[in-house]
From Swiss-Prot:
Database matches in SMART domains: LON
Taxonomic lineage from the root: Eukaryota, Metazoa, Chordata, Craniata, Vertebrata
Organ and tissue specificity: Detected in heart, brain, liver, kidney and testis (at protein level). Ubiquitous.
Native species: Rattus norvegicus
Record note on modification: Ubiquitinated, ubiquitination is mediated by its own DCX protein ligase complex.
Primary location recorded for the protein, binned into one broad class: cytoplasm
Acidic residues: bias regions: 24-38
Binding positions for (S)-thalidomide per the UniProt entry: H381, W383, W389
PROSITE patterns: CULT, LON_N
Name of the protein in question: Protein cereblon
Composition bias type Basic and acidic residues, residue spans: 1-10
Residues recorded as bearing Phosphoserine in the entry: S25
Topology versus the membrane: Peripheral membrane protein
The protein's annotated pathway: Protein modification; protein ubiquitination
Amino acid sequence: MAGEGDHQDAAHNMGNHLPLLPADSEDEDDEIEMEVEDQDSKEARKPNIINFDTSLPTSHTYLGADMEEFHGRTLHDDDSCQVIPVLPEVMMILIPGQTLPLQLSHPQEVSMVRNLIQKDRTFAVLAYSNVQEREAQFGTTAEIYAYREEQEFGIEVVKVKAIGRQRFKVLELRTQSDGIQQAKVQILPECVLPSTMSAVQLESLNKCQIFPSKPISWEDQYSCKWWQKYQKRKFHCANLTSWPRWLYSLYDAETLMDRIKKQLREWDENLKEDSLPANPIDFSYRVAACLPIDDVLRIQLLKIGSAIQRLRCELDIMNKCTSLCCKQCQETEITTKNEIFSLSLCGPMAAYVNPHGYVHETLTVYKASNLNLIGRPSTVHSWFPGYAWTIAQCKICASHIGWKFTATKKDMSPQKFWGLTRSALLPTIPETEDEISPDKVILCL
């Protein structure tokens, strides 16, 4: 890419480097072909119908078929101290429950993964807030659940699918003679809070509580009435206290989850209730994994040990941080919360890996602005089968923002969308005349 080295090209390229123009092209024509302003985004509209198979991105078919799958899971006791090997090249803040695809070719990494397969298949992913940070204080255990070895141009390559399991605090880091880091960590527990009404509610009367049956659909007027009636009965014991009912609902897991689900339905109109975790802990992690926030905010969420507080923070972020700007420019708006939509079963954002081993957490939006497109569309190693990708850069600073995806067939819907990498985005709070400055707004963290 223009103005960047080969190392950065490999990180931003989804597939192999392809010739963009014949060698005898003129320099001026080549420049026009190499960098053009994206005009489609100005007229982009949210797709009414999506006929793309949303299960394809989550299966990571670009890694190849016939991967060896493992069953069962490894969970360590809360507050226990464990020594876990660290995979060095993974620069990502992994959330429990989040899928992590990897493509490893360094002999040290290949050897390490082989050893892990023979043991508990668990490694540590350290959480760094920025590249310059030398020591991480927190992280997440990751467990390999699918694995494949192959040779590419005589080089042994290991392809892996792993999933985040448990949060931990780093106690000590040591490097072995073979160069592999070993992390001594303390597994962080999840604080499960009782119901907000448990202190004033008589247990003997619990069996007498009769709640109305849940509605089949959440879109009609009946569902709203059902929720109001349900809330009234659930918090009826608030009448015995000096505090109003709405105050207790602010710290009620079910109420918080319902408010977040309303936001998620704006991103995915076809969102099904049974596709989301019912457990508040798992649900809070699912939401954290698909929020387009920077590493600083994400580490703050990872530190929180209570699902209630995590849900409150996530709802606060979703309500306030409605604008996504270029992280390098900081003031160039790329997209907004209203343009986000889901093209995957796991939500609007997921982690993908390119052939060079770089992991990108990619957010799907149907409209983006202030972008230049670099090169011609390519289907090589596409994370969304049936779509060709084109590298997209910030129009102001030329930093890599993501890719534009265009359908290869006319009957596909959507015909185009944008995949923006989380590491290039900065969530911001829009400033209005009636509001205080964004840097003075404090999020619920």
